[in-house]
Amino acid sequence: MTAAPTWWVYLLRCGDGTLYCGIALDVEARLEQHRAGKGAKYTRGRGPLELVYREACHSRPEALRRERAIKRMRRSAKAALL
C-alpha cells in the first residue's frame, strides 16, 4: 500500500511585501507556476516571489482547512509563523 501524497500549505512573500497563502502537492512546481504568471491572479505582477513558509498536511481537506485558518490570521500572526 502506498502512502497518500503529502499536501503542503505555503506562504509566498510578494515583491510588494504582501503575503500569499496557497496549497499544493509540489510547492516548488507551484512556485514556478506563480513566477511564470500561471498561478493565482493575486501573484501576477507582484514579483519577485519568495517562498517563506511551508507546512505539511496529510490530506487535501486538512490543507484547505489550514489554508483558510492562515488566511484569516492577522498579518502579525502570519509573521509569527515565519
Locations of the language-model features?
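GIY-YIG nuclease catalytic motif and its immediate N-terminal context
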Residues: 1-71, 75-82
